[in-house]
Structures are given as structure tokens and as C-alpha cells.
């Protein structure tokens, strides 16, 4: 450890080391509060985490890295609360998911992606709950599920498709429960009777 004090409070750069002597953390303090750049490293010296503190709270962009140095995820903070997009990446660098935050709650369009960049899921969040149309896709881009949410609860139409685009099931949800008549198709049975 290397510490600096001013008026009995941590002030300046704080460094923590692994037993082998390589840097583990480099942190800035001002009047006893985390303030400024923050870095965390692996034993091998690779950057694992970086961000900024402002008067003891996470602020601005934070980055998480894999041991190979590639970006794993990034977050934006305001007053120690997620605010902005949180983005996760595949090792290839392709976006895996994008989550919109407003003052700590998911708000906006949530999207996830397959490793090739094709869409995987898409849904709108309002005040931390799914709201409106939800879509999920197969890896080849074909539609897998279409559903609807109201305040985080399944409400309305539900359609489920196989990877050939054939309808598997269709029905309605009301306050999270299946209601009414549901159509369910079993492609293997249908193909057998068509031969």
C-alpha cells in the first residue's frame, strides 16, 4: 500500500499491489472520498476495470475488460446510479446487449444480439418494467416470439414460431395468465400427416 493523508483524511493517489509487486488498484482520494480516476488490474498487469469517482460516487463512463484486454462491458453513472446505456460485448467486440438506464431504472428500448450482430430480443421498458411489444428471434433472424407486456406482465397476443417460420402456438394473455382458445401446432406431427 502507498497512502497519502491530509488533515487525517486520505488525499491523493492510493496504490494497492499484489504480493508479486504488480499494481492491483490505483485510486484517487480527495478529503477522504474517492475522487478522480479508478483503475483495477490483473496480476499480469492487464487493465480489468476503469472509471471515475466524483466526491465518493461513481460518475461518467466505467469500463470492464477481459483478461485479454478486450472490452467486456461499459456503464454510465450519474451520482452513483446507472444513467445511460449499459452495453455488454462479446469477445469479438460485437455488442451482446444494450440496456438503457434512467436514474437506476431500465427505461427505453432493451436490445440483445447474437454473436454475428443479428437481433436476439427487443422490448421497451418503462420505469423498470416491460411495456408493449416483445420480440425474440432465432439465430438466423427469423421471428421466434411476439408477445405483449403491460407493466411487466404478459398481456395480449402471444405467438411462438419455430426456426422454419412455422407457427407453434398462438393465444392471448390477460394479467399474466393464458386465457381463451390457444392454437398449438406440433410441426413433426403435421409433417407426418402431410406425407
Please describe what each predicted stretch is.
Residues 1-195:
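Glycine/tyrosine- and acidic-biased, solvent-exposed loop/turn segments at the edges of beta-strands
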Amino acid at each position: 500500500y502507498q497512502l497519502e493523508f491530509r488533515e487525517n483524511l486520505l488525499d491523493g493517489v492510493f496504490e494497492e499491489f499484489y504480493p508479486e509487486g504488480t499494481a492491483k488498484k490505483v485510486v484517487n482520494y480527495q478529503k477522504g472520498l474517492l475522487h478522480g480516476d479508478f483503475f483495477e488490474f490483473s496480476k499480469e498487469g492487464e487493465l480489468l476495470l476503469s472509471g471515475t469517482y466524483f466526491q465518493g460516487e461513481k460518475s461518467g463512463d466505467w469500463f470492464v475488460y477481459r483478461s485479454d484486454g478486450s472490452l467486456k462491458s461499459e456503464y454510465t453513472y450519474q451520482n452513483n446510479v446507472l444513467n445511460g446505456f449499459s452495453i455488454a460485448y462479446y469477445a469479438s467486440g460485437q455488442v451482446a446487449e444494450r440496456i438503457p438506464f434512467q436514474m437506476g431504472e431500465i427505461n427505453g428500448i432493451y436490445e440483445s444480439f447474437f454473436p454475428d450482430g443479428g437481433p436476439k430480443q427487443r422490448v421497451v421498458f418503462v420505469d423498470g418494467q416491460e411495456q408493449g411489444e416483445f420480440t425474440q428471434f432465432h439465430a438466423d433472424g427469423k421471428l421466434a416470439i411476439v408477445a405483449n407486456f403491460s407493466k411487466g406482465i404478459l398481456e395480449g397476443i402471444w405467438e411462438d414460431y419455430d426456426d422454419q417460420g412455422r407457427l407453434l402456438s398462438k393465444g392471448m394473455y390477460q394479467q399474466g395468465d393464458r386465457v381463451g382458445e390457444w392454437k398449438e401446432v406440433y410441426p413433426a406431427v403435421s409433417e407426418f400427416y402431410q406425407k
